From Swiss-Prot:
Site feature: Interaction with the K-D-E-L motif on target proteins: R5, E117
Protein name: ER lumen protein-retaining receptor 1
Domain of life (superkingdom): Eukaryota
Changes after translation: Phosphorylation by PKA at Ser-209 is required for endoplasmic reticulum retention function.
Stretches of the chain found on the membrane's Cytoplasmic side: 25-32, 80-92, 136-149, 200-212
Gene: Kdelr1
Family: Belongs to the ERD2 family.
Oligomeric form and interacting partners: Upon ligand binding the receptor oligomerizes and interacts with components of the transport machinery such as ARFGAP1 and ARF1.
Localization, UniProt: Golgi apparatus membrane; Cytoplasmic vesicle, COPI-coated vesicle membrane; Endoplasmic reticulum membrane; Endoplasmic reticulum-Golgi intermediate compartment membrane
Amino acid sequence: MNLFRFLGDLSHLLAIILLLLKIWKSRSCAGISGKSQVLFAVVFTARYLDLFTNYISLYNTCMKVVYIACSFTTVWMIYSKFKATYDGNHDTFRVEFLVVPTAILAFLVNHDFTPLEILWTFSIYLESVAILPQLFMVSKTGEAETITSHYLFALGVYRTLYLFNWIWRYHFEGFFDLIAIVAGLVQTVLYCDFFYLYITKVLKGKKLSLPA
């Protein structure tokens, strides 16, 4: 494992922990898109169905378990534990426009036409756009809480570091995964505007709000 992947995993884990702490400490999921969190739960479930059949390392297995457990815990808190605080009126993105195309694409473009490989490919495609409901929600409300901004920034950093991970692997290992790289680029591009607002506002102590 290279440094970029390790730091990317840490950033991803930090994002998940920030979100869980935000919801638990405030006893509220206001400003959080339940739809994005459901999509992430689907992503991790589809990607890590090989948990019991493909052992790589203790680190890899532990991270898989943590991602799955945390994603479903987040969904549970939003739709059950703190559902009274869930802002469904603003969480209105049509997720079928993300799930259906990525599922079809996974069947058409994959590395190997087997159930686990298709599910893995589907998870890669879906993860690249799973944050859209959250970004759409922020655009509808016009602002985001600081902790939510930190969560989104950490997710963006995770994807950016993973792009460097692919570059590193290609240069030093000759490994090239076009599906993962293209999906990672798409996901990183989606964060670009948010990165700018985060750097120019949140890091200066201001609340993240969209231009009128």
